[in-house]
Amino acid sequence: MESGGVETTRQGKTESLQYAVGPMAYVYARSNLTIDPEEWGLLCAKSSDQPSTAVAPLIPGLTVEEAFNTSIAAIIATKSSGMVGGAASAILSPCHFSPSVYVFYGGERINATSLAPGLTALCDEARTKFGFSSPPPGGPVSNAKETSGETICAALDMDPETTMLYLVVAEPFCEAVYMCNTFLHFGGADSVYINSEFVRRVPIYPVQMYMPDIALRLCRNPFDTNSRNIGEGCAYPKPLYNKSLNRVLHGAVLAPQGQSLRTRDLEAVARAATAVAFDGNFEGCVLAADKTFTQPATPQAKSAAQKPQADVERRAACSLAADLALTTRVSVSCAPYKFEGNASAPYCQWPMFCDAKTPDERAAALSKFMAELAGIVGAGFFAVNSPLYASEVVDGGAAADPGDKHASSNLTRFFFACGLHTLGCPTVDYAGNRVSDGTGDCALASASGFEYGPEHLAYACGFSPELTARALFYLERCSRYQLGADCRGGANTLKFVAAETTMAAECRWCTETTRQYCVRHTLHRLRSRLPTPRAPRRGPMAVFGAVDAEYTDCDQLGNFAPYSHMKRAGEGDSARNVMNDTYRGLCGRVMQFLVSEGLVRADTGEDARNIQSAKDLCDTYDRISNMVDEECAKFIAALSGARGYHYKEHLASSAHTFAVSLNPYSTSFCPMLSHLVTQTKSIILQDLILSQVPSTFDKGQPETKMFRSAAMPTLRSAFMGMLDKGFVSGRQEPVVVSASSVTAPDTSVPSTEKSVAQYEYSLTRGQVLKLKEFKVKNRIVFNGFEGRRGGVRMQGMADSFSRPASVKHINILGGPLGFLLKRYHEMIFGPENNVFQFWNKVIGGTMPMSHLTPEIRKTLNYIRRVSKAYAESNYVKAQPQTILELANFMVTNKILEYCGHGGTNGSFYISTPSAAVMSATRNKDPSAELAWLPAVANPTTKNLTEAAEKSIASEPEKNWVSTSMVTNACRLVMGTKPIIGLGIMVSKYIGQQSSTTVFQAGNWSGFMGASGIQSVNAGLSGDTTRKCMLACKRTGALIKAGPSSSFTESSLAGQVRSMVEAGCTPHAIYAVALRVLGEGLRDVTTDTWVAIVEDRFLIEALEELHAQIAASTPNGWTHEAAMAELNKHGNEEVATDGEMLNFDCDDDDADKDAPHGAKSDVPNGDDEDVFAGPSAKKRTLATEILFC
């Protein structure tokens, strides 16, 4: 039977969505001999010490049939008519299926996700250490009787030796399965085909179907066959309880919820969630009695009267947010979602497999994509502001006027903070009485001495060995950064492993034979990137999700001149003509021109043409410049004419905008990613809830037990009023069912027999909460006046956005032609010097005139002239890296010129979007190779190094690691429907027309890392003018393409950036890196170079230099050999014979070829244009000056 639902599209139209009425869950039974162990291992989460269980993704064509319905109206109970002899009716609840499936039997053929040993013991220890409850050994209810996997196989007449069983369950009822409130209806078992494989499946229904005369609620004694609640004439079945299944659900479902809700009693979470799932009308508090709180750092008073009021209110806020978040999650899980667009392609049709001919090639393609994804997931573990660590609610202080419950300070009073250092602290109940002593003193006010350990990783993964193994899978594919105090020999993981193995160091989780893969070694390798909690203060929160929308405003000027603000010229003016006159239409014409000229690839935006000569370079730039001038003139004329758009006034309100999808199936292809996205939603929604808590304090006294129940209706109403108010897009949608009756098991017949009955039905929920997306924005134009009155933070932003009043330094290689000059240097100037040496000599005045032909001198003069002109009118702080970026930046600057930006805000750069796009590269780091290296006999440092280097040299097809490259063509990246990670600061403010309406804005912000933002990912920038996100493209991999110890400025990275701007050669930069990193430079990773220099061409030059030094010495790379090679290069004499080119002339038309030292009319004043780099009077630049 089918029933119709209602779904509202983004355009406001309503479309019908058909539901298949059916069971709330299935157990799928299939042969494990037909699965590909390697592919399943790359997709699933499986621990090596739990061979039969795993958490797998919900993927059509892999774990479920291609026609699988993700949204259903599930039968959750029956209800008596109340008349003697009357038939019972069914109760339906709309819901969608969980994005993960749970393998609980027969998973031995699936490869372990990580070879790390002892993850189950680690998770059990961490759970106990941090005070979370463990699965009861006898089951979650009394007298539980297990239904084993062998029993299920026997009932289906399948071989238990070769059968694999896994649970596919509706999202709201995962806890109901855990609480043994369901049963297997073997009589309703059917067959489906998954990728041409015959698979059996057994439907699961709730035991409440046999209890028609009681109110719909959690059944606390489901194994009591003599219960008076069982209906007359019912053949009561055996409830489903499987110990392995419950263990998997405890770690993958319950513990993550307990973590985000700050509730350590996970059995209480299961009971509460089950009760709310069955009772659609419940609006009270279900966790209040079981909630505990971290004890404050200040000593507790002996009596309740002496307890600080602020701490009572903090506990009230923590409890209310958790309760409302739980009921909201259940309500949202009842809303319909489906695979969007091309994302519904079955597994066998994923684009990444289109060129794969063999299973090995398929596994290699899958391994490569997962390595790309590691950059996103890794950020979830490296970021201090990750939702995985937001375990503490902090009170920032009440408003100055207690009576003003809508004061802005009240909206931001409570906020989340990283609580890793408080996990073992003592806990108190709501009254403030200690209930647990914890494992150490509370350090709520200080994180000094904190060290991230394996227990913290297990906590972030819900104490699930499966999810912990999956997390390690991604961390093993993240690069270490040799930047920081521990970058030298002590951080060498190979030595760390060898020393511990030979010394037979005791470890609770590994043995002598498995110590090579121990979790401690992965964390040791990445320890410079692991998070360290900071002093609690309100800041951005890390957000992870997917972009599903076709339309985003992520060009340099965002939603400037949008379609909605354009006037029509008349009735005959088509929508196409109007769109053509928008800023987006302008960007489209620019792109079309570049494609038609053969300069840019239409699908990726990358350069499609090689520069062949100096003349070609000049002609290409002139063509782009002329096109930009013409198109921008037409654009402005249209805006000020027929379109009636006041572009000067609207510039200040323009913003970059896009949306993060809340569809759970956008990220369902990876269990760890689903976990990260689910935690993101929970924390973000609770942040909104916390803003409304202070308004409930006038409903009663927070210290009383009844306060939370009394305040909940007010809080719920206030939270629902925040939907569709700028940040969270969602609404309550009605549930409409059109079927006349439904088919369900006949309760008078044993569940092992095939028998069904027709039931009339009713709905437990008349409407559901459908959340669609988080809206993110970033204002483009910075208002400098706010910086003068906004305190230290705003003043710092003003300093970052500040633009020099006049151009004194022209950075040739960082200017408009820099990327072309670096890429095609040999084609333009010849192979005599590499690009960095050449420009170092030209700018520094050490280039002999005899080495330059008249054509080269003419080209140099042209480059200087256009670079200077660009710099004088440039308001984009980023450097173009492609022809498309160059054209877009030129368009941006031209429009800003028309808008008068130079006159009104000419002293400030604009804010621009960028994306660190994830990619995969072959691993070069021997210490990372340990994770998948076969066990090494006699694991000394030498043997480990030789084995790792041999493995690297062989270039196995699956040993990929994550890397990234930054692009400023953000809208093109958004067009690939990427998985993204970024920081968001949610601002809340009161509406002008209503004092009770709270609007929000999801402001694009950044990550927070232990050693700066680059410890999260090397591609990120700490420059506040550049808003950067992490992005992993789905188009081309999962979705078919459409028709169209310090990272601060005083650190090594800051020093090298200064050298790059000064035009230093790769040898000089390499010398500085060698001084700082020492032996750590031996196995330097690409991501380390990215974090230092950001310039892809310079990175290639540095890696080539590193390889040359290693190849030039008989014993490979050593610190001494590297120093000797650099000294040899540094002693090369600069040519002094003949005249030198003077490239420091201000007059472009006079003295073009004046020799160095010749008399010039250029004044030697402060406003003289000099190029970034050494003075013409200095022949060399000593690296020692960087350490003065």
Swiss-Prot record:
Cellular location(s): Host nucleus
SUPFAM superfamilies: Viral ssDNA binding protein (SSF118208)
Domain of life: Viruses
Keyword set includes DNA-binding: yes
InterPro entries, per database record: DBP_sf, Viral_ssDBP_head, Viral_ssDNA-bd
Region annotated Disordered, chain positions: 1145-1175
Keywords: DNA replication, DNA-binding, Host nucleus
GO molecular-function terms, A-Z: single-stranded DNA binding
Required for nuclear localization: annotated segments: 1166-1188
Subunit structure: Homooligomers. Forms double-helical filaments necessary for the formation of replication compartments within the host nucleus. Interacts with the origin-binding protein. Interacts with the helicase primase complex; this interaction stimulates primer synthesis activity of the helicase-primase complex. Interacts with the DNA polymerase. Interacts with the alkaline exonuclease; this interaction increases its nuclease processivity.
Family that this chain belongs to: Belongs to the herpesviridae major DNA-binding protein family.
Function, as annotated: Plays several crucial roles in viral infection. Participates in the opening of the viral DNA origin to initiate replication by interacting with the origin-binding protein. May disrupt loops, hairpins and other secondary structures present on ssDNA to reduce and eliminate pausing of viral DNA polymerase at specific sites during elongation. Promotes viral DNA recombination by performing strand-transfer, characterized by the ability to transfer a DNA strand from a linear duplex to a complementary single-stranded DNA circle. Can also catalyze the renaturation of complementary single strands.
UniProt-recorded name of the protein: Major DNA-binding protein
Lineage of the species this protein comes from: Viruses, Duplodnaviria, Heunggongvirae, Peploviricota, Herviviricetes
